[in-house]
Amino acid sequence: MAKLPFDIDLKGKVAVVTGGGGVLCSAFAKTVAQCGAKVAVLDLNQDAAQKVADEIAAEGGEAIAVAADCLSVESLQKAAGEVEKRLGTPDILINGAGGNHPRGTTDDEQLDPAAIGQVKTFFDLDPSGVQFVLNLNYMATLLTTQAFAKNMAGRGGNIINISSMNAFRPLTKIPAYSGAKAAVSNLTQWMAVYFAKAGVRVNAIAPGFFVTNQNRALLFDESGKPTARTDKILRATPMGRFGEAEELTGTLLWLLCDAASGFVTGTVIPVDGGFSAYSGV
């Protein structure tokens, strides 16, 4: 009987995880460390990154915390130099930095002409807010890949971008975020083609609804009761619940395992409890 290919051994690998201080990406960092990789936890918040690195070290793993602004070429180049010096050349890049901004959202789900001037509509979107969201998701992914993937070319590497089910089915109220994540998915496919002959695979994970520090206030009120938005989300999610961060790691590890997914590149994989498959009828 042939040996199963799904043996996740990342010993000797160096992994860089951006947004590593957050709920989802800290789970990614801990998972790859558990499989033997040396991990650079990058975050704009040094303390958040250090907390994750310390937790990895407490479990016997090897990790460093690196403060980095994924929208600054200078900051990223400095971070890349630090990772190279302290851990070695990266083999894995997880582009997890991203997010939304209130100035890129509307108050209404559909336009009521009578409400113009009464609530924040499409016509009130702040261009700087929209641009910030596009930068934070799309440009951060592009710039971070430029900083860390150059030395992968020719020696092999694995890039995992974090998209969203918004990229498949845009949600109401958040046009900037939905558009930005669609751009990340498109960039993932473009990079997969571009890097294919250089031995670098590029894929993306598209999470559905997971409770994070960024969206908690939108999903629950101050008493911890689910908001109306949460009720609508769960009705549209066939599994009827939010995902847990650990439920993303199986897909992550499959994509990182060359024996199991070595012919997989350019994919955007939803992990969303069926949200993107549900028509609502």
What role is predicted for each listed range?
Residues 6-40:
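Canonical Rossmann dinucleotide-binding motif of NAD(H)/NADP(H)-dependent dehydrogenases/reductases
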Residues 104-131, 233:
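Substrate-binding pocket helix/loop in short-chain dehydrogenase/reductase
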Residues 145, 180:
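Active-site helix of classical SDR
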Residues 156, 196, 201, 263-265:
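Short, small/polar-rich loop/turn modules that mediate ligand/substrate recognition or access, typified
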Residues 164:
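Residue(s) in the substrate-gating loop at a strand-loop-helix junction
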Residues 170-178, 187-192, 218:
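Active-site loop-to-helix junction immediately N-terminal to the catalytic Tyr of the SDR YXXXK motif
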Residues 241-271, 276:
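C-terminal substrate-recognition "lid" of short-chain dehydrogenase/reductases
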